[in-house]
Amino acid sequence: MTLLALGINHKTAPVSLRERVSFSPDKLDQALDSLLAQPMVQGGVVLSTCNRTELYLSVEERDDLQEALIRWLCDYHNLNEDDLRNSLYWHQDNDAVSHLMRVASGLDSLVLGEPQILGQVKKAFADSQKGHMKASELERMFQKSFSVAKRVRTETDIGASAVSVAFAACTLARQIFESLSTVTVLLVGAGETIELVARHLREHKVQKMIIANRTRERAQILADEVGAEVIALSDIDERLREADIIISSTASPLPIIGKGMVERALKSRRNQPMLLVDIAVPRDVEPEVGKLANAYLYSVDDLQSIISHNLAQRKAAAVEAETIVAQEASEFMAWLRAQSASETIRDYRSQAEQVRDELTAKALAALEQGGDAQTIMQDLAWKLTNRLIHAPTKSLQQAARDGDNERLNILRDSLGLE
């Protein structure tokens, strides 16, 4: 049995190829069935995200293994093998285990240390268990990877610092306000960055969210997801006073929030402080707002400096994380190698027990028939000894005849002979 990890990711393939190799969720069962129908595949997990498509497999070793799996992947996606081959990576046994642990821990992600990948790996594993997981070694590898990812996040600072604009904006808000459970946040825009911000805020149980956007339909979809209120951009002037935090990211060519608008809001708030995070380019908030007392304005450049500092911290933490992964992968492979001997040990013990039971039964029968106990016990001991050493003796004799000193030494060591 061999463990494999093969696939492509953001480092080896452009999005034009990644999208062709991805597995759609509604056809994943079909893909897994097709994969497990391959004669060499004993168990499989398919991980398919926007940044990677990977197969984690337990397989029987054979000469054409790599060619057969590449052929299956290309046939399934109607790809030319040459298109895929140059972008494909292939990891086996210890390298496969290390790769999965690195992926689950966020060490192989586009954003170093990002936590979302662990959930994606867990979902891929759960999907594979719906009648598809057949290899206990593969299952154990995934379970171990989950615990390693948890250890990495617990013992290092890999996820402690924000390295995305959206996460940095939320981190800044949480640093300034002791708790988000008592604040109102106004989000201006409804694009991808604001979507991420809204989800981060929901996770931190913000008291209230208001989304202002040019088109209500797009904002309403996000609002329904995070439990927010939707308003028009034209309503910002009137509603700004309610917001303790304003995070803005639109594509407007001109500022949406001006100095006068913020002055009026601060006056209505009796000068309670406002945090404004402008992550738009061009800027959504007039720079002069930052000169107002109790208005704390941060631009995307301010966040980038935070991100750069935090990324350096993450890279330092990643060195610690890599050490953990190397150690855990080595220990897992040692466990796996030990398991490969378990079946042999069970068979050997079972064989010895059968000999014992057979000869003991004959000895007891002889005793019941009135035979001499000492003679019967000596006969039992002699037969038991001969039966148990018969196979090892033959192996030793054959090794000697073959002149195989290495095998002789291994057998001597196995039998506990000095």
Swiss-Prot record:
SUPFAM superfamilies: Glutamyl tRNA-reductase catalytic, N-terminal domain, Glutamyl tRNA-reductase dimerization domain, NAD(P)-binding Rossmann-fold domains. It comes from Escherichia coli O45:K1 (strain S88 / ExPEC). One of its GO terms (biological process) is protoporphyrinogen IX biosynthetic process from glutamate. Gene3D superfamilies: Glutamyl-tRNA reductase, N-terminal domain (3.30.460.30), NAD(P)-binding Rossmann-like Domain (3.40.50.720). It comes from the Bacteria. Catalyzes the NADPH-dependent reduction of glutamyl-tRNA(Glu) to glutamate 1-semialdehyde (GSA). InterPro entries: 4pyrrol_synth_GluRdtase, 4pyrrol_synth_GluRdtase_dimer, 4pyrrol_synth_GluRdtase_N, GluRdtase_CS, GluRdtase_dimer_dom_sf, GluRdtase_N_sf, NAD(P)-bd_dom_sf, Shikm_DH/Glu-tRNA_Rdtase. Its EC number is 1.2.1.70. NADP(+) binds at G189, A190, G191, E192, T193, I194. NCBIfam families: hemA. Substrate binds at T49, C50, N51, R52, S109, E114, P115, Q116, Q120. During catalysis, the active site Cys acts as a nucleophile attacking the alpha-carbonyl group of tRNA-bound glutamate with the formation of a thioester intermediate between enzyme and glutamate, and the concomitant release of tRNA(Glu). The thioester intermediate is finally reduced by direct hydride transfer from NADPH, to form the product GSA. This is Glutamyl-tRNA reductase. The lineage of its organism: Bacteria, Pseudomonadati, Pseudomonadota, Gammaproteobacteria, Enterobacterales. It catalyses: (S)-4-amino-5-oxopentanoate + tRNA(Glu) + NADP(+) = L-glutamyl-tRNA(Glu) + NADPH + H(+). It is an enzyme of class 1 (oxidoreductase).
